[in-house]
């Protein structure tokens, strides 16, 4: 706890007043300088729209544009041109390759179609020749069979004729013998062989 004496109390306000008087101008000066700076900053135009900086702005614009133009002309544009040329060359090569492959495919298709047509023609020719050969062989076999049958029929007819002739001859002999036996039984005597044969022959003619 502090005790303030009357003498100290009188001196203290004077000292404080002197100190404040000495310090106030400094604070005022700082305040005044700060106020002036802040006022100027608040009242000044937007820097890009400040006419006093147009020259520097135009200069930097020209410099920036020139640098950008040089960059485009020397670096970016050549790279883009090289890329476009490379793409154009690649596309041209791809188109040429596609055309070559298409031509090869068309040639292969034509060759295949030609070979297929030749194979069909050959197959048709072989089939036709086989049919003609089979038809000729069948005709030849038919003629051979017909000739063989004709010969067999002729031989059979000759044989049948011989059998008929022999049978008729045997029938005549049997008839003559039978007639002679009948006459012998009827008249009690033998008839002449010539008469019996003549009678049998006459009977054959009448039959």
Curated annotation (Swiss-Prot):
InterPro entries, A to Z: ATP_synth_b/b'su_bac/chlpt (IPR002146), ATP_synthase_B_chain (IPR050059)
Q: Topology with regard to the membrane? A: Single-pass membrane protein
Q: Which Pfam families match?
A: ATP-synt_B
GO CC terms of this entry: plasma membrane; proton-transporting ATP synthase complex
Q: Which UniProt keywords apply?
A: ATP synthesis, Cell inner membrane, Cell membrane, CF(0), Hydrogen ion transport, Ion transport, Membrane, Transmembrane, Transmembrane helix, Transport
Give this protein's Gene Ontology molecular function annotations: proton-transporting ATP synthase activity, rotational mechanism; proton-transporting ATPase activity, rotational mechanism
Explain the purpose of this protein: F(1)F(0) ATP synthase produces ATP from ADP in the presence of a proton or sodium gradient. F-type ATPases consist of two structural domains, F(1) containing the extramembraneous catalytic core and F(0) containing the membrane proton channel, linked together by a central stalk and a peripheral stalk. During catalysis, ATP synthesis in the catalytic domain of F(1) is coupled via a rotary mechanism of the central stalk subunits to proton translocation. Component of the F(0) channel, it forms part of the peripheral stalk, linking F(1) to F(0). The b'-subunit is a diverged and duplicated form of b found in plants and photosynthetic bacteria.
NCBIfam families (UniProt xref): PRK09174.1
Q: What is this protein called?
A: ATP synthase subunit b 2
- What is the scientific name of the source organism? Rhizobium etli (strain CIAT 652)
